[in-house]
Amino acid sequence: MRKPSLLPIITEKTPGAAGGIQRAKQIQGGPAGILYGQSFHFVIKSPNKGTESTIQPRRLLPPLKEVSVVSRIGIVIKPNKPEALALAREMIGWLNQKNIRVYLDTAVAASIHHAPSCPQEEMSKCVDLLVVLGGDGTLLSAARHMEEEEVPILGVNLGGLGFLTEITLEELYPVLERVLEGKVETEKRMKLHAAVIRQGRTVGEYAVLNDAVISKSILARIIHLRSSVNGAYVTTYRGDGVIISTPTGSTAYSLAAGGPIVYPAMDSVLITPICPHTLTNRPLLIPDEATVEFTLETEESDVRLTLDGQVGCDLLPFDRVVIHKAQKHVSFIKSPFKDYFQILRTKLKWGER
């Protein structure tokens, strides 16, 4: 694996009452001016000669990883989308010419008469790379089934907004060429684990890439959710519900509810209230190692937990929803042609009048 070159150590001394602070930093260069794996090393020098203390370096952003050799590629497509089927046929021919073995999701393999196929929930055991043709919803569904974090996902946008499926049709084959040459990098995204506990028994467990949403299902009534972080009481949310999202999900429902945009490679958990009755309830960002718990204190039973907008379960009064960081990540292929901030500018139309 090619290692990023290290820039020279920069030493800077600032005068101070205690004899000054000498700072040295060694950084790894990254694309577009972003310093991946950047760390700072501080040496505090005392007026007494021969004594100093060191603050250990802290990584600000996780390093990107290069993709290893790819010989088996899986393709997952959005069902009943003709352009996705046509593109899959075209990709299979292109990849076969390069001696790449292609696996299709069993649910759609028969429709284009292709073999071999593999159930989506087992795809991570069959392939070195998963290509998703569709929108963010298709990618979210595929990511939930990826058991092995070593298998990266390349999302190709055939849908609408496409925050997760960041590769365009025009970029698809140039990116695939780079993948086969080992010249692209992956970025790990954290997932959440959500559990529903009813009368002391776990009745449901879920993997979450974007967000977990606790909300009223039908009737327009205020629901009460008692919240705690690591066992410490935070507040009781009164409103339409609450969104618990990953940094990846911060540009989804949470953003529409007034939450901030969180850089997707960060490890943190975002809690965003939905239409809170108490106007001082604001979004809350907590560390990724924290466990957050919500207890439904509403007597009505028309409240639902929804995961990534696709699966979920009905909640009963006094059910507890416990959420923490999942053990495994999801790896995405990074676009070599644009960075995250270019994607934000394009998708959110920043600067347009």
Predicted feature descriptions by range:
Residues 214, 230-233, 279-353:
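ATP/nucleoside-binding phosphotransfer catalytic cores, i.e., glycine-rich phosphate-binding loops
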Residues 41, 49-69:
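Short, Lys/Arg-enriched N-terminal segments with co-localized hydrophobic residues
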Residues 161-240:
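Catalytic core of DAGKc-family lipid kinases
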Residues 84, 137-142, 251-256:
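Short glycine/serine/threonine-rich phosphate/pyrophosphate-binding segments
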Residues 1-14, 21-22, 26, 36:
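Extreme N-terminal basic, low-complexity initiation segments
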Residues 61-129, 170-185, 196-206:
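ATP/NTP phosphate-donor binding region
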Residues 235-239, 244-280:
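Gly/Ser/Thr-rich active-site loops/lids in small-molecule metabolic enzymes
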Residues 36, 40-42:
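Aromatic (phenylalanine/tyrosine) cluster motif
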